[in-house]
Amino acid sequence: MAGATDQRRQEVLRAIVADYIASQEPVGSKALLERHNLKVSSATIRNDMAVLESEGYIVQQHASSGRIPTEKAYRTFVDSINDIKPLSVAERRAILGFLERGVDLEDVLKRSVQLLSQLTRQAAVIQLPNLNVSRVKHCEVVLLSPVRLLLVLITDNGRVEQRNVEVDQICEPEHVAKMRDVLNRALDNKTLSDASASLAELAAGEILVDPDIQPMILRCATVLIETLVEQPNDRLILAGASNLTHIAREMPSSLPAMLEALEEQVVVLKLLTNVRDLGHVSVLIGEENEDEQLRGTSVVTTGYGAQGATLGGLGVVGPTFMDYSGTMSKVYAVAHYVSRVLSGG
């Protein structure tokens, strides 16, 4: 759209979208004049609305009702959002404080989706880090009893895995110290795939170790390999699906498919896996979603990470009439502070 007339129609369209998002009620020309400083006559507004309707931006459900935006209108509205509005200092401080109370990586991520679902009143999702990009930070060996050990594997992005190991000989404290040293020399700062290869060498006896601890090292290496191999590359944490029940009246046909997609996870995981950039918020509206189950929804996503590397995606799934500006701001803010906490800042 170009020129003064087209610019005015853009303003009318933005006003219609904003009013419908706020009320979920059809918008008429009289209401637009009352709520917005459009500085034109009611007849001009009606003419603009007729043009917008002919161009596919708005529709009239009933002859006597106002207009509602189409997905084309929502896309134009989202594309007109030039800057993501920052949250208030109090909101940012509250987000950071809540996330910093997380005891480990998974707790931080659970807190992030709980918070995001509360802030946006939508369903919030986050992808746990792909372990293929993780590195082993430390392996701790704890003596629980003379024949039972606890192995604690810690990755550089804060992931913690714990496994109990039963051994076939009496384990002394000095054995524990030796095993800790052997395992950390084999694992330290290795990617998880390389760590698995090192553990396989230990299990096969290709790396020389003290004969006193070799059987126990074999058992520990086997358990750690199983731990690394069994971890799925992609897992999803979901919160706030119940928030979507409020849209049942406006979108009765979309809600079941939306809830099914969230429950199955595969569809949403595919979306989050494609998130690559930190700091960029992406919005998919209705038919822009490749998967049929999400074509009645809008999905707002971004990446989170540590030390500048993307670890996964997070976002919200909601109705096409969501508050796009507010949702984009909140998704961006939560991702920013998740990244900050994971980076140790």
UniProtKB/Swiss-Prot annotation:
Family (UniProt): Belongs to the HrcA family.
Pfam families xrefs: HrcA
Name of the featured protein: Heat-inducible transcription repressor HrcA
Gene3D superfamilies for the chain: 3.30.450.40, Heat-inducible transcription repressor hrca homolog, domain 3 (3.30.390.60), Winged helix-like DNA-binding domain superfamily/Winged helix DNA-binding domain (1.10.10.10)
Keywords tagged on the record: Repressor, Stress response, Transcription, Transcription regulation
GO biological process, one term: negative regulation of DNA-templated transcription
Organism: Corynebacterium diphtheriae (strain ATCC 700971 / NCTC 13129 / Biotype gravis)
MF terms in GO: DNA binding
Keyword Ligase attributed: no
Gene name of this polypeptide: hrcA
Known function: Negative regulator of class I heat shock genes (grpE-dnaK-dnaJ and groELS operons). Prevents heat-shock induction of these operons.
Entry annotated with the keyword DNA repair: no
